[in-house]
C-alpha cells in the first residue's frame, strides 16, 4: 500500500534528495507522538511536527504505525496502557472505582484522549481489554444483559468530565468560557442561598492550579460514587425481579 502524502505542496527544496532517519521503530514514533499530545492535545499537533521531531519521512511513519487517524488511536492506547485490570476478587463497585480512578490519572496527562475515547469507543486494544474485563465483573455481579449499559453509563459519565476540562485547556481558536467567567456571571444578580453554594463550588474550580485540580479530582470521585449508587439500586431491583 502506498502511503498518502502529507498535506504539503512540493517545493524545489523539498524535492531535493535528503537523508532521513529510517532506522526508527514504532515505539519511538509513539513516544514522540505521545509527547506532542501531552503538550498540544491528541489532535493538536501536525504530521509536520512529528516528522520534524523524528527527522524522518511520512512513508516511514506510515509503514510503522499508519495514517494520522491510526496515530491518534495508537497514542490514546499508549496513554491508557498503564491502567491495570483490577483484581477479580474485588466486588463490582470496588472494581469499577479502581478502574475509573486509574483512568482519570491516565487521561488527564494526555489532553484530548478522553474526547477521543468518547467519540470512538473501544477502538483500541487496551480499551477493549478493559471493557471486556469490566463487563465480566458486572455480569458476575448480576447485571446480566444490562452489564454493557451499566459499564457505558459509568465510563461516559466520568470521562465526560475530563473531556470538558480538556476543551478549556486545549487551544482551539474558539472562545471557551472558563470558570472565572461563569463565577462573574453567576454573581451579577447578587447571591441567594442556593446560588451561593454553586458560587463556592465554581470558585474552587476557578482557584489556583493546585486547588482547581484537587477540586476536579474530588468532583470526579463524587460523580463516580453517585453513578455507582444508581447502578447499585438498579442491581438490587434486578435481583429482586428474579425472585
Language-model-detected regions and their locations in the chain:
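Hydrophobic alpha-helical bundle segments that form small-molecule/ligand-binding pockets
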Residues: 130-186, 232-234
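N-terminal intrinsically disordered/low-complexity leader segments
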Residues: 1-24, 84, 195-207, 239-243
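A structured, mid-to-C-terminal "fold-capping" secondary-structure block
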Residues: 177-243
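Basic, helix-initiating cap at the start of DNA-binding domains
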Residues: 1-49, 65-73
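Key DNA-contact positions within bacterial/archaeal DNA-binding proteins
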Residues: 48, 59-60
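Alpha-helical structural segments
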Residues: 27-35, 39, 53, 63, ...
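Amphipathic alpha-helical segments used for helix-helix packing
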Residues: 76, 104-133, 163-167, 171, ...
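Hydrophobic alpha-helical connector segments
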Residues: 84-129, 145, 151-154
Amino acid at each position: 500500500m502506498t502511503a498518502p502524502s502529507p498535506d504539503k505542496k512540493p517545493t524545489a527544496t523539498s524535492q531535493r534528495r535528503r537523508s532521513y532517519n529510517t532506522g526508527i521503530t514504532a515505539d519511538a514514533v509513539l513516544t514522540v507522538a505521545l509527547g506532542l499530545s501531552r503538550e498540544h492535545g491528541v489532535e493538536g499537533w501536525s504530521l509536520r511536527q512529528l516528522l520534524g521531531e523524528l527527522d524522518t519521512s511520512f512513508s516511514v511513519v506510515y509503514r510503522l504505525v499508519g495514517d494520522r487517524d491510526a496515530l491518534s488511536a495508537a497514542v490514546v492506547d499508549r496513554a491508557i496502557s498503564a491502567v491495570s485490570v483490577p483484581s477479580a476478587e474485588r466486588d463490582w463497585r470496588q472494581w469499577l472505582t479502581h478502574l475509573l480512578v486509574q483512568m482519570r490519572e491516565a487521561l488527564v496527562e494526555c489532553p484530548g484522549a478522553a474526547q477521543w475515547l468518547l467519540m470512538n469507543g473501544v477502538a483500541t486494544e487496551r480499551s477493549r481489554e478493559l471493557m471486556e474485563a469490566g463487563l465480566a465483573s458486572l455480569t458476575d455481579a448480576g447485571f446480566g444483559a444490562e452489564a454493557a449499559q451499566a459499564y457505558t453509563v459509568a465510563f461516559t459519565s466520568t470521562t465526560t468530565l475530563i473531556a470538558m476540562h480538556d476543551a478549556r485547556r486545549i487551544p482551539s481558536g474558539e472562545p471557551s468560557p472558563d470558570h472565572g467567567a461563569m463565577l462573574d456571571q453567576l454573581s451579577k444578580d447578587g447571591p441567594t442561598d442556593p446560588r451561593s453554594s454553586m458560587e463556592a463550588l465554581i470558585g474552587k474550580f476557578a482557584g489556583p492550579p493546585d486547588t482547581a485540580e484537587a477540586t476536579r479530582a474530588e468532583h470526579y470521585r463524587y460523580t463516580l460514587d453517585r453513578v455507582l449508587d444508581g447502578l447499585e439500586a438498579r442491581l438490587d431491583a434486578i435481583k429482586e425481579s428474579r425472585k
